[in-house]
Amino acid sequence: MTSSTGIQTTKEIAAAVETPGVTGRSILGYGIIGFLVGVLPIVLGLAWLPSLRRADARWTSAFLALTAGLLTFVAFDALGEAFELQAGLPTSLHGTGLVLLGVAVSSLALTFVTARLSGRTGASTSGSALATLVAIGIGLHNLGEGLAIGSSFAIGELVLGTFLIVGFMIHNIAEGLGIAAPLAEQSKVKAPQLAGLALVAGAPAIAGTWIGGFLVNDILGAPFMSIAVGAALQVVVGIVRHLARRAPGGLGTGHVLGGFLAGVAVMYTTGLLTG
Protein backbone atom coordinates (compact mmCIF):
# COMPACT_ATOMS: atom_id res chain seq x y z
CA MET A 1 0.00 0.00 0.00
CA THR A 2 1.39 3.41 -0.97
CA SER A 3 0.31 6.59 0.82
CA SER A 4 -0.21 9.98 -0.79
CA THR A 5 3.32 10.96 0.31
CA GLY A 6 4.88 7.97 -1.40
CA ILE A 7 5.53 5.90 1.74
CA GLN A 8 5.00 2.21 1.12
CA THR A 9 3.61 -0.09 3.80
CA THR A 10 3.55 -3.87 3.49
CA LYS A 11 0.91 -5.85 5.36
CA GLU A 12 -0.42 -9.36 4.86
CA ILE A 13 -4.22 -9.51 4.60
CA ALA A 14 -6.17 -12.71 5.06
CA ALA A 15 -7.95 -14.12 2.01
CA ALA A 16 -11.31 -12.46 1.53
CA VAL A 17 -14.09 -14.93 2.18
CA GLU A 18 -17.73 -14.45 3.04
CA THR A 19 -18.47 -14.96 6.71
CA PRO A 20 -20.63 -18.09 6.78
CA GLY A 21 -24.26 -17.73 7.71
CA VAL A 22 -26.05 -20.16 9.96
CA THR A 23 -27.20 -22.72 7.39
CA GLY A 24 -27.59 -26.48 7.53
CA ARG A 25 -24.53 -26.89 5.34
CA SER A 26 -22.30 -24.63 7.43
CA ILE A 27 -23.48 -26.23 10.68
CA LEU A 28 -22.68 -29.67 9.27
CA GLY A 29 -19.30 -28.50 7.94
CA TYR A 30 -18.14 -27.02 11.23
CA GLY A 31 -19.56 -30.03 13.06
CA ILE A 32 -17.47 -32.42 10.95
CA ILE A 33 -14.35 -30.33 11.62
CA GLY A 34 -15.05 -30.42 15.36
CA PHE A 35 -15.57 -34.18 15.23
CA LEU A 36 -12.28 -34.73 13.38
CA VAL A 37 -10.39 -32.47 15.78
CA GLY A 38 -12.03 -33.51 19.05
CA VAL A 39 -13.85 -36.84 19.08
CA LEU A 40 -11.88 -38.95 16.59
CA PRO A 41 -8.40 -38.34 18.11
CA ILE A 42 -9.74 -39.03 21.61
CA VAL A 43 -11.15 -42.37 20.40
CA LEU A 44 -7.78 -43.25 18.84
CA GLY A 45 -6.06 -42.43 22.13
CA LEU A 46 -8.54 -44.56 24.09
CA ALA A 47 -7.73 -47.47 21.78
CA TRP A 48 -4.48 -47.86 23.76
CA LEU A 49 -6.45 -49.03 26.82
CA PRO A 50 -5.94 -52.81 26.26
CA SER A 51 -2.16 -52.31 26.10
CA LEU A 52 -2.19 -50.17 29.24
CA ARG A 53 -4.16 -52.79 31.17
CA ARG A 54 -1.50 -55.40 30.43
CA ALA A 55 1.29 -53.14 31.64
CA ASP A 56 3.12 -53.44 34.97
CA ALA A 57 1.83 -51.28 37.86
CA ARG A 58 4.91 -49.05 37.60
CA TRP A 59 4.18 -48.35 33.94
CA THR A 60 0.53 -47.67 34.72
CA SER A 61 1.71 -45.07 37.23
CA ALA A 62 4.05 -43.67 34.57
CA PHE A 63 1.15 -43.19 32.17
CA LEU A 64 -0.93 -41.54 34.89
CA ALA A 65 2.00 -39.18 35.50
CA LEU A 66 2.14 -38.62 31.74
CA THR A 67 -1.51 -37.54 31.93
CA ALA A 68 -0.57 -35.05 34.67
CA GLY A 69 2.21 -33.73 32.44
CA LEU A 70 -0.18 -33.37 29.50
CA LEU A 71 -2.66 -31.39 31.56
CA THR A 72 0.01 -29.24 33.20
CA PHE A 73 1.17 -28.16 29.76
CA VAL A 74 -2.46 -27.62 28.69
CA ALA A 75 -3.04 -25.41 31.74
CA PHE A 76 -0.04 -23.14 31.22
CA ASP A 77 -0.59 -23.00 27.46
CA ALA A 78 -4.23 -22.01 27.95
CA LEU A 79 -3.25 -19.47 30.63
CA GLY A 80 -0.85 -17.79 28.20
CA GLU A 81 -3.55 -17.66 25.53
CA ALA A 82 -6.09 -16.30 28.01
CA PHE A 83 -3.83 -13.41 29.06
CA GLU A 84 -2.97 -12.74 25.41
CA LEU A 85 -6.66 -12.53 24.52
CA GLN A 86 -7.60 -10.39 27.53
CA ALA A 87 -4.98 -7.81 26.51
CA GLY A 88 -7.18 -6.91 23.54
CA LEU A 89 -10.37 -6.52 25.57
CA PRO A 90 -11.85 -3.15 26.57
CA THR A 91 -10.47 -1.97 29.91
CA SER A 92 -14.02 -1.78 31.30
CA LEU A 93 -14.15 -5.60 31.26
CA HIS A 94 -11.11 -5.90 33.58
CA GLY A 95 -9.59 -8.69 31.49
CA THR A 96 -7.04 -9.86 34.06
CA GLY A 97 -9.71 -10.21 36.72
CA LEU A 98 -11.95 -11.99 34.23
CA VAL A 99 -9.23 -14.56 33.54
CA LEU A 100 -8.48 -15.15 37.23
CA LEU A 101 -12.20 -15.44 37.99
CA GLY A 102 -12.59 -18.07 35.27
CA VAL A 103 -9.68 -20.07 36.71
CA ALA A 104 -11.12 -19.92 40.22
CA VAL A 105 -14.70 -20.78 39.24
CA SER A 106 -13.74 -23.77 37.09
CA SER A 107 -11.33 -25.05 39.73
CA LEU A 108 -14.01 -24.87 42.42
CA ALA A 109 -16.53 -26.52 40.10
CA LEU A 110 -14.17 -29.44 39.46
CA THR A 111 -13.52 -29.70 43.21
CA PHE A 112 -17.26 -30.09 43.73
CA VAL A 113 -17.49 -32.72 40.96
CA THR A 114 -14.54 -34.59 42.49
CA ALA A 115 -16.23 -34.64 45.90
CA ARG A 116 -19.47 -35.96 44.38
CA LEU A 117 -17.68 -38.67 42.40
CA SER A 118 -15.59 -39.68 45.42
CA GLY A 119 -18.69 -39.87 47.58
CA ARG A 120 -20.34 -42.13 45.03
CA THR A 121 -17.38 -44.50 44.52
CA GLY A 122 -15.74 -44.56 47.95
CA ALA A 123 -13.31 -42.63 50.11
CA SER A 124 -10.78 -42.09 47.34
CA THR A 125 -11.22 -41.20 43.69
CA SER A 126 -11.49 -44.36 41.57
CA GLY A 127 -9.82 -44.80 38.20
CA SER A 128 -13.19 -44.37 36.50
CA ALA A 129 -13.92 -41.13 38.36
CA LEU A 130 -10.42 -39.84 37.65
CA ALA A 131 -10.85 -40.60 33.94
CA THR A 132 -14.10 -38.61 34.00
CA LEU A 133 -12.35 -35.62 35.55
CA VAL A 134 -9.56 -35.83 32.98
CA ALA A 135 -12.16 -35.96 30.19
CA ILE A 136 -13.92 -32.87 31.58
CA GLY A 137 -10.67 -30.92 31.77
CA ILE A 138 -9.67 -31.91 28.24
CA GLY A 139 -13.16 -31.15 26.97
CA LEU A 140 -13.02 -27.59 28.26
CA HIS A 141 -9.65 -27.14 26.58
CA ASN A 142 -11.01 -28.59 23.33
CA LEU A 143 -13.79 -26.02 23.46
CA GLY A 144 -11.10 -23.35 23.18
CA GLU A 145 -9.36 -25.24 20.37
CA GLY A 146 -12.61 -25.45 18.42
CA LEU A 147 -13.16 -21.74 18.99
CA ALA A 148 -9.73 -20.98 17.50
CA ILE A 149 -10.40 -23.12 14.42
CA GLY A 150 -13.88 -21.75 13.80
CA SER A 151 -12.71 -18.15 14.21
CA SER A 152 -9.78 -18.63 11.82
CA PHE A 153 -12.07 -19.88 9.05
CA ALA A 154 -14.66 -17.19 9.73
CA ILE A 155 -12.15 -14.33 9.30
CA GLY A 156 -10.54 -15.84 6.19
CA GLU A 157 -7.41 -17.41 7.70
CA LEU A 158 -7.89 -20.60 5.69
CA VAL A 159 -4.28 -21.81 5.83
CA LEU A 160 -4.08 -21.21 9.58
CA GLY A 161 -7.35 -23.05 10.11
CA THR A 162 -6.12 -26.05 8.13
CA PHE A 163 -2.87 -26.22 10.10
CA LEU A 164 -4.82 -25.98 13.36
CA ILE A 165 -7.00 -28.94 12.34
CA VAL A 166 -4.01 -31.17 11.58
CA GLY A 167 -2.06 -30.03 14.63
CA PHE A 168 -4.91 -30.41 17.10
CA MET A 169 -5.80 -33.86 15.74
CA ILE A 170 -2.30 -35.13 16.54
CA HIS A 171 -2.32 -33.18 19.80
CA ASN A 172 -5.57 -34.77 20.98
CA ILE A 173 -4.50 -38.37 20.38
CA ALA A 174 -2.11 -37.89 23.29
CA GLU A 175 -4.97 -36.48 25.36
CA GLY A 176 -7.06 -39.59 24.60
CA LEU A 177 -4.20 -41.68 25.94
CA GLY A 178 -4.31 -39.54 29.07
CA ILE A 179 -7.96 -40.48 29.62
CA ALA A 180 -7.21 -44.17 29.09
CA ALA A 181 -4.44 -44.26 31.71
CA PRO A 182 -6.69 -44.05 34.82
CA LEU A 183 -9.01 -46.70 33.35
CA ALA A 184 -6.17 -49.23 33.21
CA GLU A 185 -6.77 -49.92 36.91
CA GLN A 186 -10.40 -50.91 36.32
CA SER A 187 -11.16 -54.64 36.08
CA LYS A 188 -13.79 -54.03 33.41
CA VAL A 189 -14.63 -51.03 31.24
CA LYS A 190 -17.76 -51.11 29.09
CA ALA A 191 -18.02 -49.63 25.60
CA PRO A 192 -20.76 -47.11 26.57
CA GLN A 193 -18.45 -45.69 29.25
CA LEU A 194 -15.64 -45.23 26.70
CA ALA A 195 -18.08 -43.62 24.26
CA GLY A 196 -19.28 -41.26 26.98
CA LEU A 197 -15.73 -40.24 27.89
CA ALA A 198 -14.90 -39.65 24.22
CA LEU A 199 -17.92 -37.36 23.89
CA VAL A 200 -17.21 -35.48 27.13
CA ALA A 201 -13.64 -34.82 26.01
CA GLY A 202 -14.17 -34.38 22.27
CA ALA A 203 -17.65 -33.01 21.63
CA PRO A 204 -16.86 -29.54 23.07
CA ALA A 205 -14.58 -29.06 20.04
CA ILE A 206 -17.71 -29.24 17.88
CA ALA A 207 -19.45 -26.61 20.00
CA GLY A 208 -16.29 -24.50 19.84
CA THR A 209 -16.16 -24.53 16.04
CA TRP A 210 -19.80 -23.47 15.88
CA ILE A 211 -19.27 -20.63 18.35
CA GLY A 212 -16.04 -19.49 16.68
CA GLY A 213 -17.48 -19.78 13.18
CA PHE A 214 -20.81 -18.05 13.75
CA LEU A 215 -20.04 -15.71 16.66
CA VAL A 216 -16.67 -14.18 15.80
CA ASN A 217 -16.01 -12.45 19.11
CA ASP A 218 -12.66 -12.08 20.89
CA ILE A 219 -14.45 -11.47 24.19
CA LEU A 220 -15.44 -15.15 24.36
CA GLY A 221 -11.89 -16.46 24.01
CA ALA A 222 -10.42 -15.26 27.32
CA PRO A 223 -13.08 -16.73 29.65
CA PHE A 224 -13.15 -20.02 27.73
CA MET A 225 -9.40 -20.42 28.04
CA SER A 226 -9.35 -19.40 31.71
CA ILE A 227 -12.03 -22.00 32.49
CA ALA A 228 -9.83 -24.62 30.82
CA VAL A 229 -6.88 -23.54 33.01
CA GLY A 230 -8.72 -24.02 36.29
CA ALA A 231 -10.16 -27.36 35.21
CA ALA A 232 -6.82 -28.73 34.04
CA LEU A 233 -4.99 -27.67 37.20
CA GLN A 234 -7.64 -29.20 39.45
CA VAL A 235 -7.43 -32.50 37.57
CA VAL A 236 -3.62 -32.47 37.91
CA VAL A 237 -4.05 -32.11 41.68
CA GLY A 238 -6.40 -35.10 41.67
CA ILE A 239 -3.95 -37.23 39.69
CA VAL A 240 -1.04 -36.31 41.98
CA ARG A 241 -3.07 -37.31 45.05
CA HIS A 242 -4.03 -40.57 43.36
CA LEU A 243 -0.40 -41.34 42.50
CA ALA A 244 0.75 -40.49 46.02
CA ARG A 245 -1.58 -43.22 47.34
CA ARG A 246 -1.32 -45.85 44.61
CA ALA A 247 2.02 -45.52 42.77
CA PRO A 248 4.66 -48.15 43.75
CA GLY A 249 7.37 -46.18 45.53
CA GLY A 250 5.41 -42.92 45.65
CA LEU A 251 5.84 -39.74 43.64
CA GLY A 252 9.63 -39.68 43.62
CA THR A 253 10.21 -42.76 41.45
CA GLY A 254 11.78 -42.58 38.02
CA HIS A 255 8.64 -43.92 36.37
CA VAL A 256 6.47 -41.15 37.81
CA LEU A 257 8.91 -38.31 37.22
CA GLY A 258 9.81 -39.60 33.77
CA GLY A 259 6.14 -39.99 32.85
CA PHE A 260 5.37 -36.42 33.92
CA LEU A 261 8.25 -34.97 31.90
CA ALA A 262 7.32 -37.14 28.93
CA GLY A 263 3.78 -35.75 29.05
CA VAL A 264 5.06 -32.18 28.95
CA ALA A 265 7.45 -33.06 26.12
CA VAL A 266 4.73 -34.74 24.05
CA MET A 267 2.40 -31.77 24.33
CA TYR A 268 5.19 -29.31 23.56
CA THR A 269 6.27 -31.27 20.49
CA THR A 270 2.77 -31.72 19.08
CA GLY A 271 1.99 -28.12 19.99
CA LEU A 272 4.70 -26.96 17.57
CA LEU A 273 2.41 -28.12 14.77
CA THR A 274 -0.15 -25.49 15.76
CA GLY A 275 2.29 -22.75 16.70
Task: List each model region and its residues.
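Short, aromatic- and glycine-rich surface loops/edge beta-strands on solvent-exposed regions
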Residues: 1-3
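Intrinsically disordered, metal-sensing/regulatory segments
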Residues: 6-275
